[in-house]
Amino acid sequence: LRKAETTNADMVIGNRMSETSSMPYIRIAVNKLMSGILSKISGCDIPDSQCGFRLIKRNVLEAIKLESSNYEIESEIIIKAARKGFKIESAPIETVYKGAPSRINPVVDTLRFIAFILKMGTHPIFPKAIKGEK
C-alpha cells in the first residue's frame, strides 16, 4: 500500500527476485524470461511478472476487458494496463515456499505464455503492439 501511495501507482506487483535462495532454479529462470518479455512489451520494469501479490486499483480493472482464465491473466492485466497508460510499479516482498507443491508446470505454462503473447499480438516481432497500438 505504501508503494502505491508514495508513487501514485495504479498497480503494484510484488517482487520476490531480490532474494531467490529458497526459489527453485527452474522457477527463477522461467520467471526471468517471462518478466523480461513482459517488461519489453509493456514498456515498464516488471522484475517479477508471475508474483500473485498485487495491488490493482479498481479503475484499472474496470478499464480493461480480461479474456484469459488461467495463469495468463497475470500477464494480460500487465499488458492491458500498460497499454491504457496506467502506472505500474513493483515492491520487494519476501519469497515464501512452505513445501507445498506448485500447481504451475514450468514447461506447459511457459508454452501457454508464448501462445498467449502471440495471440495478443504482442510478440517482440510486432513493434506496433509493443507501443500499444492496435
Tell me what each language-model feature is.
Residues 12-14, 48-49, 90, 126-130:
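Short, hydrophobic secondary-structure boundary micro-motifs
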Residues 1-71, 97-114:
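Acceptor/aglycone-binding surface of glycosyltransferases and processive sugar-polymer synthases
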Residues 44-45, 66-69, 78-96:
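Catalytic donor-sugar/metal-binding loop of nucleotide-sugar-dependent glycosyltransferases
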Residues 40, 84, 120, 124:
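Phosphate/oxyanion-binding loops and surfaces in catalytic or ligand/nucleic-acid-binding neighborhoods
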Residues 77, 117:
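Aromatic/hydrophobic pocket-lining residues that form π-stacking "cages" and hydrophobic walls in ligand
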Residues 30, 51, 55-56, 78-82, ...:
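Residue-level signal for alpha-helical context at structural boundaries
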